[in-house]
């Protein structure tokens, strides 16, 4: 069984038993995924030619941002290439501090594709909060918006 098939079998088992916690807990077996990248092996494969909505953000003022699976896959590929050019490598810890906006989801998916470890951070964090997270998380890279770069001045 391929890694993708093992992942899907585990996912399907949990979905099948989602209302029976005891059975799900007792019988679930973690798939043996020696070489598996969810973003590349599952998401991108599912996204190929898939124009169904993958991301739909509705702002408080009613504005909407929509991306299909195919669009999100392609856009996250571009972000992954940019992150790679910035020096992000497999295993690097990357703190992502963006609001609920399209770039957040593009960047998260891109980081997964590169094998980076994502440390999500709310935009409500203070500079002191960020010092703690960056130090304890051994963060090597930060992605944030221009509005929040000043919060990193102490680092």
Regions found by a protein language model. Give the residues of each.
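Structural core segment of the AMP-binding/adenylate-forming
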Residues: 1-6, 85-86, 109, 113-155
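N-lobe entry segment of adenylate-forming
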Residues: 1-67, 71-84
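Acidic-enriched, low-complexity/disordered segments with a strong bias for Aspartate over Glutamate
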Residues: 12, 41-44, 61, 92, ...
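Small/flexible residues
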Residues: 13, 20, 92-95, 115, ...
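Short N-terminal micro-motifs specific to bacterial/archaeal maturation
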Residues: 34, 63, 95, 121, ...
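Tryptophan-centric aromatic hotspots in well-structured domains and transmembrane helices
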Residues: 38, 104-105, 122
